[in-house]
Amino acid sequence: MGFRCGIVGLPNVGKSTLFNALTETAAAQAANYPFCTIEPNVGRVAVPDPRLDKIAAIAKSAQEIETQIEFVDIAGLVRGASKGEGLGNQFLANIREVDAIVHVLRCFEGGDVTHVEGRVDPIADAETVETELMLADLDSLERRVPNLVKKAQQGDKEAKAEASVLGQALDLLRETKPARLTQPKDAEEERALKRAQLLTAKPVLYVCNVDEADAATGNALSAAVAAKAECEGAASVVISAAIESEIATLPEEERQAFLFDLGLEETGLNRMIHAAYALLGLITFYTAGPKESRAWTVRDGAKAPEAAGEIHSDFERGFIRAETIAYDDYIRCGGEPGARDAGKLRSEGKDYVVQDGDVMLFRFNV
């Protein structure tokens, strides 16, 4: 399945440095200038997965294929974007197309990199961006909801669901709260909220960009952001974009030593990628064989035919059953033959809800 995270933030907070490190390219021009990233830069990065390495080793696979997540480096936002100031209109259009927002916040001092607001205050920065998104949503809903209410009063069932859930979102926005706090009462309202593509309904991951010295522990600024995230149902990670950019240029064998010297167990990018994956409500299942072992992505709660469809639409259309082994059983039993002998291979039908880590073989007929 396709899923995209938009990297956003005020100018000069480290967005493009972070994106460059993510994709190990210099595709985005990381310069000390507010609008150095005018066109969105898109990069697909592998989701780090030690489980896949173990599965491939047991299956003696010739190739490993990780699942991927797409990051979009979106042009810097400034105050007034909801009215089209700066690159506001372009920013809002680009962010509307992503599934989740990765909001980079400056949590480091340093006079050599200018701040567009002339101060370092990540909470204020977060509120500046959130306010612009809320104003854009507010403008949209104040025009849409009255029309939906009229249609609902005339007996339009679809409009009734939309009017209910979007009316709730509008009330939240008027209280300066994001639309992601909206609580749809049923699946129909949930679909209506998703169709509305509200900017503040998208899940948010705050990335606290800190100095090298704070990369392992964070600092007072990143702690304040973490507290904010917890209060509003968002997530946060601490990262040093400058360090990650340096790590990205190192040979694999030198990276672990570099991380050890910094007191880090894994790169900040890996933590960020996993956090984004979880934020989108995604899980991983696997296929394994001599030719390749591969990680696949589905939404949490997906049933077996939907997972089969990620491989090929024919698999979903002609789904018969899914021969399934839990990851721990696959490793413990040394692969599919051992799991079968131990009674750990299950034959699951169309109502089976896929579990994170399942190793699956789909049987189908078209």
Model regions and ranges:
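Short amphipathic alpha-helical segments with heptad-repeat character
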Residues: 92, 131, 135, 142, ...
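C-terminal-of-GTPase-core extension/linker across diverse P-loop GTPases
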Residues: 2-8, 13, 19, 147-355, ...
